[in-house]
Every structure is written in structure tokens, then in C-alpha cells.
Amino acid sequence: MIALSDSTLHRLPAAVAVPRYDRHALKVGVVHIGVGNFHRTQEALYIDEALHLPGNESFGICGVGLTDGAAARAKAAAYKVQDGLYTVTEFAPDGIARTRVIGAMIDYLHGPADPEAVLARLTHPDTRIVTLTITEGGYNIDETTGVFTLTAPEVAHDLAGGEPRTVFGYVVKALARRRAAGLAAFAVASCDNLRGNGDTARNAFVSFARARGPDLANWIDREVDFPNSMVDRIAPQVSDAERAKLNASSGVDDRLPAMAETFNQWVVEDRFRYGRPALEAVGVTFRDDVAAFVAVKGRMINASHMHMAYPSILRGERIVHEAMRDPRIVRLISTFLSRDVIPYVEPPTGVSVANYETMIVERFSNPAIGDQLLRVGGDGASKLPIFHSKTIATLIAAGADLSREAFLLACFARYLLGRDDNGSDFPVFEPVLTAADWEQIRDEPAGVLRAAPFTSLGLADHASFRRAFDRVTETLAQYGASKALDDVLAET
């Protein structure tokens, strides 16, 4: 295999597509914070395609990592060795794979190692866009009040001055420097999977800045664009075994290969007053009604992902496409969509949801992706309210059947125990649940309905929901998820 770097691009196997533009002629115009697999296979891929078109040379990417630890340092070192290059292998449902090298990231900075370098890059006049993938729960917004939490330890540290540690500290400090130097601001574009991600980002950064002083906060609120967007692509984690397999298949020795499905969608508001690459020429959709796209995607695709994940994990499954081999899971998704979502959702103008069910099942069933159920189910306390609150509220208002949503939350409560029906333990990743939340959850399964992320749903005291929830909870405890799944399907 050939080690990946700028100097070896011309020697890579012919089947591997490589950048055809001059990477040395690029300037950094985009700083991306949180360089995970999703960014590398979505935004960075679109920008890579745009860089092949004339006039976009000013929009190379500088990646930034803010987490510390051995893995984060190893990632930074690998990007340096590989000159920011990495491979993406896209797998179609029929198994056909295509590998390409992404050259859009021309620099990578590790904040804990050199905070000033990150600030200098953010402050540089060439930087016109800062994009984010910091996870749905990374905006430090209280789920119940919608207020930015100033007392979070790392936030409090950054507000006290000194070298920043949080994304809020870095971005706001850089904007303060730009303002003091008479430079224009930049756009801050969230690419995280939540409704109103731009509005959420505005709330977070302006609130942080307001704690420093009203003048800076007002300037940021006025001068920084925060476009809303909808992003959609499945890009699973790559294990060591999968890394070896990807590299053996491509013939490229890549320390950081990424993989994804062929489906890719990015819908974004065109609010980039300081300039942007011509992304519309490479498949990105610019629309004013992003919220409608987010609603359809969240309530149908992301919500279905969660319906599939928790009962499957409890039954001992760990891989998404293997869980989809159970026709009951396919039927659960189909029934959820046809009865609980499609009759009530309003799709964007010109968009039909008629084929969504088939598309969702096909995407989830892609055997080449090997997506992890624990990844899909992780951080459920953040994701479930985001993707299911509107559906639950709509069903309650319509006096409709709540059995499938009760089944989902009962399975989630059981999942939080960290043990499946076979007696095997699994890790539970729920960073937004507090000690008080966990205390309620350990007292009884229904405690999850009173946990802070779920209180706004009002389900703990909703009689018909509680009857269904308690019934599923009892079945899960006595007979397991397979019987509970049979029961909820028998009710439809």
C-alpha cells in the first residue's frame, strides 16, 4: 500500500480519485470545528468538489479539534503526516464502492496544543466562514428553558479569561479581536443535526458574548450570519478492523479513512454575506424554507433511526443493517411513518414524502455501511426530544394512538440500564443526563419521563401515554424486547 500524502497522490491506484486542483494555490476561507466523520464525508466533500471549479480557491478548510487526550493528539499528528488528506469510500446499497481522496482540508490545528494558533486562524482576514459539528448537545442550551448555561465549568473558565477551552470561548474571542482590528465578522454555520441549528448557534454564541459585555454581543448578533441548515448522510465510525479493510481495498495506507453511504444532502439558507464557495454547483440546495426540510428529515429519518435502535439493542443486535433484517423492525418503521408522521407533516414545496419509507428502509439496510446501533442510540436524551417531541405533541392534540411512541420511550428507559435481554452489558453514552436525572431513572423506568430533557413533553402525567408506557415497561422487564415488539405491532 502507498502511504497517503501530497507527494504520493500521483502514485495512488487508478481506481482512487484524487484532487485535480492545485492544493498549494488554495487559501483557508473556512474553519471547521469538530472534524469528525460526518464533516469529513459531507461538508468537506462538497467543498472538495467545489474546489475543482474556478473561483473557489479562497475556500480551503482549516480543521480544528478542541478535545484533548491521546486519541485527539494522534488524530492531529496523522493529519500533519498526511498533509490533511484522507480517503472517503462511498458504499451504494448494491455493494458498489467508490474511493476518493479529499483535499479540501489544507491545515489542521489542535486547540489544546496551541490555542493561539486557532485564535490567529479565526482572526485572519481570509477566514469568512466557521462551520461546526459539535453534536446536538454541544451548544450548552438548557433543553427546558432554552437558555445558555453560563455555569458550566468550561464555559465559566472561558468567561474568566485566559486561554479558551470551549468553542464559544474561541469563536467569541476571535470575533472580539476582529472587531477591535476593524475587520469584518464571519458566518457561523452549524452543521449539527438539530432543528434551527443556526438559531441555536446564535443563541449560544450571543449569550456567551453577552456575559462578557453587551456591546460585543450586540455586534455579533448584528454582524455574524448564522444560517440554518439541514444535513443528511450516514457516516459511521471506522473501527481498526474496518480501517484495515478499507485500506486493503483501496490500496492506500490512510491513517484516517472515512466511509459513508452514497446518499448525501445539505440544504442551507443563503446567508453568507462575507462570501462562500459555489456549493449550489455541486449539489447543495439553498432554500429559505430550511425548517420544512429539517422537520421532514428529523421526524421521518432520524426518528425512525431511534425507533429501530433501542428495541434492537435490547434484543442483542449491534449493527444497523443486521437489525433491519428483522421484518418486524421494518414494519415498525413503516407503521410509525404511515400513521404517526406522514398524515401530519407538511413537506417543503416541491418535495414529496411518498417514497420516504422505501428510501429509509433501503438506507438503513445498506450492508456495506455497518453502522453501529450504539452510535445511533447514544445521546438519546438529547436526540429523542429533538426528533420526537413534535410528533408526540401532534398525536396528543389529535387524540391519536400513542402506542408506538410509548414503546420507544419505554425501550429507551430500559436501554439506560446498559444490559440487553441476553444479559450482555453495553456502554451507555448520555452526556446531558444529570445526577438528578439518573437518580429518578434508577428509582423507576417512568423516571425518564421526569428527567430534565423530557419534562417539556408532559408525558409523566398523561394518562393514556402512561398506561401504554407502563404496559411496555412491564413486558420488557418480564419477557424482553422481542415480545414487546410483537405486542406493539399487534396493536396496529
What are these regions (language model features)?
Residues 1-492:
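Substrate/ligand-engaging "lid" and interaction regions
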